Amino acid sequence: MVIPNLHNSIPICGKCDPKLTNSFIGIVLFLAVLIIGILILILFYYNKEINKNSSQYLPIHSPGSGNPSPSSSFLINNNNNNNNYHQNNNSNNNNIIYNPYYNSSTTSPYYLSPNSNHNPSLILYHQSRLLGNIHSINSINNNNNNNNNNPPTNISNKLNKNGETKNI
């Protein structure tokens, strides 16, 4: 006994129902798009976590404090020669400046000493554009304890003949 239209419901001799074929292809495509979407969401989540963890190296962050400190984020006066941010024992490293231009030749990827081959005034200038104020240039290269507490001065201030700042 022969069942009529059997080749329309199940594959026989390489033939199958076009409706079943289209449904199968649709299900496969839907699952593929779903899996790719989930993978993209996972990548975005991990990228966000990586960016959150790397935000401690932004220029407006004061190392070691845990909180942004715009007044002291780019210049750190340290009276001791053994600081944790710059491992260079060849010279006095009392002033540590954030290095916005990473150079593999420096001893630290994020901080550099003013007595390295970089220009600290140039780096300080770039920091002043971000923060709006600037420490006096004398406090960069001066290791005297009396000058470590100089307040930030405006970038338009100049020194007069007596060494005092005056506004222009």
Curated annotation (Swiss-Prot):
Residues 142-157 have a biased composition (Low complexity). It is a single-pass membrane protein. It is found in: Membrane. Keywords: Membrane, Transmembrane, Transmembrane helix. GO terms for cellular component: membrane. The chain crosses the membrane at residues 24-44. Residues 69-92, 142-168 are annotated as: Disordered. This is Putative uncharacterized transmembrane protein DDB_G0288353.
